[in-house]
């Protein structure tokens, strides 16, 4: 009866519900049950009010990933048999998503490439943040086992790598945070059910770099040879939180300096994981919080497995303190990083 009355009250709104921990979770969205937001106005209409309130309270910087267009999107995505989509062109859907993204999250325009997402944000002498775009320039998702670095085997693309190398080399900040769409060593299948294809960098072979791993290996080698210190990677995409320490001594590819990568997400979405680690770059799992086998997958936010991260940099010691938190503001993990002398 309660559900029936609620459905009448919301009218055209979709009502979805499920049972989680013996509690009813009600989710309301401004679309019909089988409707997809394929036009920019759909997403803007649904999110403008909430986004405006958030923007008034805090400074926020954005980068995009697959779900701004669709799950695991790349040029190889085939929608021919997907009846949910009346628009079958991935390029057209990506263009619409890009327009909506930039209208909702204004980013200073780059004259040489309007609509560019990758950029650097400076926070004075202690911090530069480098936002990457691992979607727009990647080759098609596939086995990710190429042995030659070409446009098809890249995930960042030539121009973005050239920009990132130059920006890192020219940075005078003590700390250089690289905000990456996707983790470097977690295996993310393009088809999760069949466990085939690769949506991320790692291919799951645990061997010498192949496919997209070659581009990352080249970047890590450059950071080492250029004596660029104090790089820290922040990432998400996967729906849980973790701390990875990349140790050359444990890696198949060893020509890089050790570094940390912190994974934190989601803030309000289904919780999945954990994902397998690929040992090409020698990741050590220092911390993880993800669903247990008994809990299952796609857990609702009401289960409490929602995460975010906090970073503080001391103005006196220049130490970086990284904390992984849950949605109830409980500290799950903390590590203090000492800066290395730059150059």
What spans do the regions from the language model cover?
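Metal-dependent phosphoester/phosphodiester hydrolase catalytic core
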Residues: 1-343
